[in-house]
Amino acid sequence: TATVFVGVNSGFNHLIRPMFYDSYHKIENLSNPKGPERIYTVVGNICETDTFAWDRKINEVREGDILVFRNAGAYGFEMSSNFNSRLKPAEVMVMDGNVHLIRKRDVFEDLLKNQIEVL
């Protein structure tokens, strides 16, 4: 059978652990939680080895669906980077079924704020 890829609006610059350590993060489709399960390879938007999961059962994914990567934890942010001038995403914590924003996403000015004018 053919490999079916799901491309997400993220990359290893946001969660590098799967690439470095082959770490497992459960991926769920929040937009279609009761859809039929399909087998997907989930890839990011960076031009390097940017694969989050191979041959993973996920409820059917459609364009625009929101996927969650479970248990990214503190290492998600601490190991993230602005590789290829990509902005860091917001972080949310789910506790007792409630979603809490715990870190705002970067804005373009965040990429430039520590640069020093040389010339």
Listing of model-derived features with the role each one plays in the protein:
Residues 1-119:
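Charged (often Lys/Glu-rich) extended helix/loop segments that serve as interaction or gating elements
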